[in-house]
Amino acid sequence: MLFGKHKQVVKRILIVEDEPLTAFDNENILGDAGYEIVATTDHFDNALEIIKRQPVDLILSDIRLRSQHNGIELARAAKARGIPTLFATGHAYPGAADVAVGCLMKPYTERQLLKAIECVDRHLQGDSVKSPKGLELFAAAGEEN
């Protein structure tokens, strides 16, 4: 057993982002850090189809999407499948805490993104985590709010 090391539960990430540059950056940052990027999309319907067909450990999603649906609705559908969502958004939205594991406020740095994913991973394992600047953690997946 390695002391100080946690078993990583977040390995496969779906990125749902309507800003192309942000999506590209997130994909590269997380991919370079060793995460498997299942897909990157800007559309609710595509994201929903992906979570129905492929294993996903975490969705990193903006709340605003290029469709009539939004990230809150996606997180609700994902939660029903046992998949946690971390919002990455520039605005706080009512109801976000009911469906997501947390919210990372834009703009954020590469370091903040990686730290946020690490904190979410530990939070999902039930660890007590101090949120870094810009990250608000909500109740862990599966807990009732």
Task: Name these PLM-found stretches.
Residues 19-39:
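Two-component/phosphorelay signaling modules centered on CheY-like receiver
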